[in-house]
Amino acid sequence: MSTLARLSLESQGDVELAKVAGEVDASNVADLSQRLLAAVSNKARALVLDLSETSYIDSSGIGLIFDAAARLRNRRQELRLVVTPRSFVGEVLAAVSMERSVPIDAQLDEALRAVDDSG
């Protein structure tokens, strides 16, 4: 992965938390996607993808989110996003109506609570 994006992973019970900081673009999306999906065990109920520290995302990053959502759905797992409202990433995801496919929360604790409520 290029130095544009940093990925940190953490398990919280049966929820995997992935935080992406920096820029997500065509130069690093393949590695980022591989690492994200490998981090989600079959026993996990959900992946919470925290993009609150992501400063930039291009169409390849958007594709990564749609692809991850489809793969997780096939495994009967949930994907939730954490995105700062009115940020660049938030505006881009709103422009492509991401919330129609993947639930978006403004805060990490909201996302974790929603996962708990759905299980």
PLM regions: where:
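STAS-typified acidic loop motif
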Residues: 3-34, 53
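Residues that form or immediately flank small-molecule/cofactor binding pockets and catalytic motifs
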Residues: 14, 86, 109
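Amphipathic alpha-helical interaction surfaces in cytosolic regulatory modules
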Residues: 26-102
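Acidic phosphotransfer microenvironment of two-component signaling modules
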Residues: 30, 109-110
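Short acidic-hydrophobic, aromatic-tinged amphipathic segments that line or gate anion-handling sites
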Residues: 101-109
